[in-house]
A protein has these predicted regions:
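Amphipathic alpha-helical linker/stalk segments
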Residues: 11-16, 72-99
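Short secondary-structure transition hinges
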Residues: 106-145, 178
Length: 204
């Protein structure tokens, strides 16, 4: 990801719930810097520069670079969980699975810059912050695991390893954030493709 120009992808509107405006600019700058350079290689000066602020001004709003990463991770994981909860609709487990995977994949494509950070910089979080994010990650896994279990129960899915298959389905969607660029594919079309692939993985 190093050297990738992603700054034009992260819209400040993502952080419209954050006050004041300076804090929003810092979050936008942090996402872009972390996605482009990686958490460890990013300095507070990098982030402040992208926000049009001095390094000292960053600490007025966030006590550390890690705190910025935590805020980004918290937002990204909660947003992804809400996408799954909203998409868990349909008369059959197959319909629900396709809806879930389609929405989850499209989200990771549309928000690939944020998703890169929240998925691949987890190790940089403090133990306390990591534990909080891990709780949300378990809820995300549960959304997929439940629909797979329902499909096994009614005989429409052939799944012998429920946790392993859950991880495989989630990984399919999440990995989109690693390679996605806007010119590669339409998020909705990609979601449909991955929904088909996930269904084929588990159908009887």
């Amino acid at each position: 990801m190093h050297g990738v120009n992603v700054s034009a992808v992260t819209s400040p509107l993502v952080w419209e719930h954050v006050q004041p405006a300076a804090a929003r600019r810092l979050l936008t700058g942090a996402v872009d810097a972390f996605a482009e350079r990686g958490f460890q290689a990013t300095t507070t000066r990098d982030i402040a520069s992208r926000a049009g602020m001095s390094p000292a001004a960053l600490y007025v709003h966030y006590p550390s670079k890690e705190r910025l990463l935590f805020e980004i991770s918290l937002y990204g994981h909660n947003a992804a969980l809400e996408v799954l909860r909203s998409a868990d609709t349909g008369p059959t487990p197959a319909d629900r699975l396709r809806s879930l995977v389609s929405a989850f994949t499209a989200w990771h494509a549309r928000h690939h810059t944020i998703a890169r950070v929240v998925q691949y910089e987890l190790a940089a979080l403090s133990p306390e912050h990591h534990a909080e994010v891990a709780t949300i990650r378990r809820a995300i896994s549960t959304q997929i695991e439940q629909v797979l279990a329902d499909g096994v129960r009614d005989g429409s899915f052939a799944v012998t390893d429920l946790p392993g298959t859950t991880l495989a389905v989630l990984s399919l969607s999440i990995d989109v954030a690693r390679w996605y660029t806007p010119h590669r594919a339409d998020p909705e079309a990609l979601g449909k493709l991955y929904a088909d692939l996930a269904h084929r993985m588990v159908q009887t």
